[in-house]
From Swiss-Prot:
Compositional bias segments (type: Basic residues): 224-240
Protein name: Transcription factor SOX-1
Annotated stretches, region: Disordered: 1-52, 214-249
Comment on protein domains: The 9aaTAD motif is a transactivation domain present in a large number of yeast and animal transcription factors.
GO function term, MF aspect, one: RNA polymerase II cis-regulatory region sequence-specific DNA binding
GO cellular component, one term: chromatin
Function: Transcriptional activator. May function as a switch in neuronal development. Keeps neural cells undifferentiated by counteracting the activity of proneural proteins and suppresses neuronal differentiation.
Localisation: Nucleus
Species for this entry: Homo sapiens (Human)
Biased composition (Gly residues): 26-44
Pfam families attached to this UniProt entry: HMG_box, SOXp
Record GO biological process: brain development; cellular response to leukemia inhibitory factor; chromatin organization; forebrain neuron development; interneuron migration; lens morphogenesis in camera-type eye; negative regulation of transcription by RNA polymerase II; neuron differentiation
UniProt keyword list: Activator, DNA-binding, Nucleus, Transcription, Transcription regulation
Motif (9aaTAD): 342-350
Length: 391
């Protein structure tokens, strides 16, 4: 049915219709809306020297029909009017289209007479660029810690620092001598601030992370100075998809300390995910929620972070464990908060099984005092990081 219109357009000096006045039903909104060739008053005022193309048969017919349909349906959108006009034009017979085809030929001949050297120059449509500010907030908050952990949070990786730490170790297994803990653990070189102001900022970020995210040891709570905006709630409910390999490597990174240097990555990995998080996570969650009197440990962690470059938080969450402890069989399901006390007593050593909360507090406090002294004495590494001299 478009054969006659296509003939009309092909024989015209300009070729096909303008982008807004396409031949056929798609162009019903272009030329008829403003009264044919005089439509688009703003564009005509801006481009007075621009010559418009002659209307085809459909444009001639739809000019009057569009006005009539708009008066009958004032709330109908112009695109819907165009669809209806196009469908109506398709079902019209050739005899009904004939007068409009003749009118289109007359208009084309008149246009050729008035503009003999006319050549159609299509206007390029400007493509709307998509705004790429999805991760502007995360990128702004993680500008200081621009290492692997920041990239992991920006990409939305569920396990956070664990994924970044695994990636760093897989990519550069021998890079620990040059970069220290910064490259082994996936943190940036500036993650251990040397100045007092940076230490105070790290302590404030740590406290904010404790209050907001409930001390997640695997992804958010262990490194609060590098991930203040990591959206993980509490550890038992945050990972129903069982991301065990990532956190095993992450716990290995946390156990890489002089307290447990006899246990390497291999001995820490089997017991890391099952044994380590629950002892530290339950104590930290109980301290944050006010379940017992361990709130002094959080204050001591903040003070140690301000004095020794935010290393107290690492010490409070490092929980050394015998290498023979099995992984947690109950981690395939999300335990209720009431089961935390049983889990603590299950994974604590035998001497500390009497009072799990007091035992966890004592263990965390002892590590708070031991770890910062070691790192203060050995803090002569590259860029303020700690050399791995105790391997």
């Amino acid at each position: 049915m478009y054969s006659m219109m296509m003939e009309t357009d092909l024989h015209s000096p300009g070729g096909a219709q303008a982008p807004t006045n396409l031949s056929g039903p798609a162009g019903a909104g272009g030329g008829g809306g403003g009264g044919g060739g005089g439509g688009g008053g703003g564009g005509a005022k801006a481009n007075q020297d621009r010559v418009k193309r002659p209307m085809n048969a459909f444009m001639v017919w739809s000019r009057g029909q569009r006005r009539k349909m708009a008066q009958e349906n004032p709330k109908m959108h112009n695109s819907e009017i165009s669809k209806r006009l196009g469908a109506e034009w398709k079902v019209m017979s050739e005899a009904e289209k004939r007068p409009f085809i003749d009118e289109a030929k007359r208009l084309r001949a008149l246009h050729m007479k008035e503009h003999p050297d006319y050549k159609y120059r299509p206007r390029r449509k400007t493509k709307t660029l998509l705004k790429k500010d999805k991760y502007s907030l995360a990128g702004g908050l993680l500008a200081a810690g621009a290492g692997g952990g920041g990239a992991a949070v920006a990409m939305g990786v569920g396990v956070g620092v664990g994924a970044a730490a695994v990636g760093q170790r897989l990519e550069s297994p021998g890079g620990a001598a040059g970069g220290g803990y910064a490259h082994v653990n996936g943190w940036a070189n500036g993650a251990y601030p040397g100045s007092v102001a940076a230490a105070a900022a790290a302590a404030a970020m740590m406290q904010e992370a404790q209050l907001a995210y409930g001390q997640h040891p695997g992804a958010g709570g262990a490194h609060p100075h590098a991930h203040p905006a990591h959206p993980h709630p509490h550890h038992p409910h945050a990972h129903p998809h069982n991301p065990q390999p990532m956190h095993r490597y992450d716990m290995g990174a946390l156990q890489y300390s002089p307290i447990s240097n006899s246990q390497g990555y291999m001995s820490a990995s089997p017991s890391g995910y099952g044994g380590l998080p629950y002892g530290a996570a339950a104590a930290a969650a109980a301290a944050a929620g006010g379940a017992h009197q361990n709130s002094a440990v959080a204050a001591a962690a903040a003070a140690a972070a301000a004095s020794s470059g935010a290393l107290g938080a690492l010490g409070s969450l490092v929980k050394s464990e015998p290498s023979g402890s099995p992984p947690a069989p109950a981690h395939s399901r999300a335990p209720c908060p009431g089961d935390l006390r049983e889990m603590i007593s299950m994974y604590l050593p035998a001497g500390e099984g009497g009072d799990p909360a007091a035992a966890a507090a004592a263990a965390a406090q002892s590590r708070l005092h031991s770890l910062p002294q070691h790192y203060q004495g050995a803090g002569a590494g590259v860029n303020g990081t700690v050399p791995l001299t105790h391997i």
